[in-house]
Structures are given as C-alpha cells and as structure tokens.
Curated annotation (Swiss-Prot):
Organism of derivation: Arabidopsis thaliana (Mouse-ear cress)
Annotated region described as Disordered, given as residue ranges: 117-177, 229-253, 266-288
PROSITE patterns documented for this protein: HTH_MYB
Amino acid composition bias (Basic and acidic residues), ranges on this chain: 138-161
Database matches in SUPFAM superfamilies: Homeodomain-like (SSF46689)
UniProt lineage: Eukaryota, Viridiplantae, Streptophyta, Embryophyta, Tracheophyta
Official protein name in the record: Transcription factor MYB63
GO molecular function annotations of the record: DNA-binding transcription factor activity; transcription cis-regulatory region binding
Source taxon at top rank: Eukaryota
Subcellular locations according to the entry: Nucleus
Pfam families per UniProt: Myb_DNA-binding
Length: 294
C-alpha cells in the first residue's frame, strides 16, 4: 500500500487566514523575478509563511496581471456552454481555454446563470407538444358532451312522440308500426308503475286506527279499574307480609323458651319425672301380678 503524496509543508508552521498586502507584494515581486516553476519551494524562497497551494491559488485567482474582472460576455458564456457539453465539470480544463478567467469563476457562473438558462430553454422547446395534448383533451371532452346532448335530445324526442301518439290515437286509426311500438312501450311503463304502487300498498302492515276523540267515561272506568287492581295487590302483599312476620315471631319465641329451659336445667327434671312415673307404673304392675298369684 502506497502512502500517497507527501504533504508540501508542515501545517503547524504555516500561516492561515486572509492574505495581507505585504504578503501579496512579496508574492508578486518574486514571481515577476523568478517565475513559478515549483510552487512547493516558492514559499521558502520568497520568505512567505504560507503553503505552496495557498500561494498558487492566490496568484491564479487574484494577483496575476492578465486576470479579467467583471461580468462574462455572451461569447464567453457560449464557449462555456460548449466546453461544458464536451468536458463536463472539468473546470480547470475549461478555464485553460478562456484566458483571464479562473476555474472558480467559471464554476460559479455555470451554477448560478447558465445551468438555469439551459433548463428554461429546453422547457420552452418542449412546450409546443403540450398544446396538442391539451387540444386533444379538450376535443375528447367536447365529443363526450356532444354525445350526452345527443342522447338527451333523443330521449326528449321519444317522450314527445309518445305524448303526440297518445293524444292523436283516437283520430288516426291506421298508424305506423313505429308508433304502435312506442305506444306499447308507454303502456308497459305505466302498467309497471301501477303494479309497483299496488305492491307497496299491499306490503304495508295493517295498522289499527285508534280515534283520538273517545268517550271520557271509558277512560274514567279504566282508571278506576287500574286503581282497584293496585289496591287489591297492595292488600294481598301486606297480608302475606303480616302472616309471615307472625310466624317468624312465634318461632323465635319457641326457640327462646327452649334455650331458657336448657340453661335452667328444666329438661333434666322432666326426664327424671318420666323415669319416676315409669318406675311407679312398673311397681304397680308387679303388685297387681302378685295379687293375682295369691
């Protein structure tokens, strides 16, 4: 792998920024005496703390005596267009054939003026094709509109012929076959419309018509019956609630008595009494048996 071109100077020891008038005088005087055969060694020989590339660009773009100032002429612009068509964006090669002009100036003029001018000229050259297309589109629209108008006129004439044929049907008995066909079509259309109306009427649901002006006695009777039903329902519900409440109260009282007897020990006394009664009954039976034996 090659290391490429070596740098022309040490960038840390070189002055940068805009040139001063003293530096311009040194560069001009040195080039007028010795020329510019080697731009790398020129800064050391002339005593300038500048890079060789900076000296070259300063001389070519600003300080050389044959440098032209001002706007480009029309001949120069035409030559730039032709050379750009041949060489492309090789600005230094184009500048070599235009004495007194730098490659930077030529590039700026191309991008700011000449390129836009060529684009506009090419657009104007392509413009004549667009009116033809617009004419064709307008013609197509006119044809469509005329076709629609013709169809509408035909329909209106058809309607007029139908009306005239129906009006003069009784007087002219020997009609043409075309008139007969038109009459038949008209009758079919009317019959179909009539059938549609009948079907719509049949499809409607049967709605009960309730008169608004009814007898007030009926409404009062309905109100009283509703109130009576509500009162009976309320009484039944209240009676059922009362019975259920009484039963629940009795159950609670019984439960309370049982609980009280269990706490006081009355249940055991009852059991003892039953045991004594059974013993007494058994003893009485034994006595009776003994008496029967003796």
């Amino acid at each position: 792998m090659g290391k490429g071109r070596a740098p022309c100077c040490d960038k840390t020891k070189v002055k940068r920024g805009p040139w001063s008038p003293e530096e311009d005088i040194k560069l001009i005087s040195f080039i007028q005496k010795f020329g510019h055969e080697n731009w790398r060694s020129l800064p050391k020989q002339s005593g300038l703390l500048r890079c060789g590339k900076s000296c070259r660009l300063r001389w070519i773009n600003y300080l050389r005596p044959d440098l032209k100032r001002g706007n480009f002429t029309s001949e120069e612009e035409e030559t730039i267009i032709k050379l750009h068509h041949n060489y492309g964006n090789k600005w230094s090669k184009i500048a070599s054939q235009l004495p007194g002009r730098t490659d930077n100036e030529i590039k700026n003029v191309w991008h700011t003026h000449l390129k836009k001018r060529l684009a506009q000229s090419s657009g104007t050259a392509d413009e004549p094709a667009s009116p033809c297309s617009s004419d064709s589109v307008s013609r197509g629209k006119d044809d469509k509109s005329s076709h629609v108008e013709d169809s509408l006129n035909r329909e209106t004439n058809h309607r007029n012929e139908l009306s005239t044929s129906m009006s003069s049907g009784g007087s002219n008995q020997q009609d043409d076959p075309k008139i007969d066909e038109l009459r038949f079509e008209y009758i079919e259309e009317a019959y179909s419309e009539f059938n549609d109306i009948i079907i719509q009427e049949v499809d409607k649901p049967d709605l009960l018509e309730i008169p608004f002006d009814s007898d007030p006695d009926i409404w009062s009777f309905l109100d009283t019956s509703n109130s009576f039903q509500q009162s009976t329902a309320n009484e039944n519900s209240s009676g059922s609630r009362a019975t259920t409440e009484e039963e629940s109260d009795e159950d609670e009282v019984k439960k309370w008595f049982k609980h009280l007897e269990s706490e006081l020990g009355l249940e055991e006394d009852d059991n003892q009494q039953q045991y004594k009664e059974e013993e007494s009954s058994s003893s009485s039976l034994l006595k009776n048996y003994e008496l029967m034996i003796h």
